[in-house]
Amino acid sequence: MSGERRLNGLSLKVGPLGEHDRLLTLLSDQEGVTRLAVPGARRPRSSLAAAVPLSLLELQVAGRRGLARVRQLKVLRSFNSVGKQLETLAAAQALAELSLMLVAGNDPLPGLLNTLLMHLERLEALSQAQPAQPNTTLACSVQACVHLLALGGYGLPVQECCRNGTALEPPLGQWEWRCSLMPEEGFAIGALPGAALQLNPSELALLQRLLRPDLPMRRDGELMGPPEVWLRLLAVVECWTRTHLPHHMRALGMLRKAIISSGDGRT
């Protein structure tokens, strides 16, 4: 069959297609986001039944016009263990949803797949932590969104004031100082009318540190920031994505509810 090719990528979304097939949405370095038919995947004992969400797959695909079909499938890695905890499941779903929004069709976004896999690995480890660590899960999720948004060209502009270009240098210890999130513009120094929310110096400093590869930790190895601060930073991400991306991210709301229900977050 024409158009035979191999694809390696992460299954972002899987849904029914007809009576026996599945529709697979795959993120790959080669093709960006690709939608594929997986014939017979809903039949019992099908060799293609492993086409499930959040799995790293190696596929043999046939056809380039219309909906290509999966001929062979091999699971390289599964992240289904994130479902052990509601918080890590909601976080993983949010990252998959965000990645899907950031890629324009078949136009690959360099670095997105590897970054997404890195953060899913962190969530996978957290899903197995005993006792559960919902605040760390929340922090990982916020940082992952910050990283993915930056890769997709929607990075949070946390380095300078959107009104006058002054460097955003939070004066730690000056608790009366504020910066305002203006949804269409970015962050502005001062408590301004029309702001979606305001951050104090320590909250802004924490947000700025999320651009680094690792989570901000104290010298004793504990995560910086209490749950209520991480919920505020989640609100920043929610506001920014709602304003600048084409669709509302429902999974972020699910994550917020899961964190609050866990007792490790406060409104």
UniProtKB/Swiss-Prot annotation:
Query: Could you tell me the superkingdom of the organism this chain comes from?
Result: Bacteria
Listed A to Z, the keywords are: DNA damage, DNA recombination, DNA repair
| GO BP annotations listed | DNA recombination; double-strand break repair
UniProt GO cellular component terms: bacterial nucleoid
Q: Which Pfam families match?
A: RecO_C, RecO_N
| Gene3D superfamilies reported for this sequence | Nucleic acid-binding proteins, Recombination protein O, C-terminal domain
Function (record text): Involved in DNA repair and RecF pathway recombination.
Q: Belongs to which family?
A: Belongs to the RecO family.
What is the name listed in the Swiss-Prot or TrEMBL entry for this protein? DNA repair protein RecO
Biological source species: Prochlorococcus marinus (strain MIT 9313)
Name of the coding gene: recO
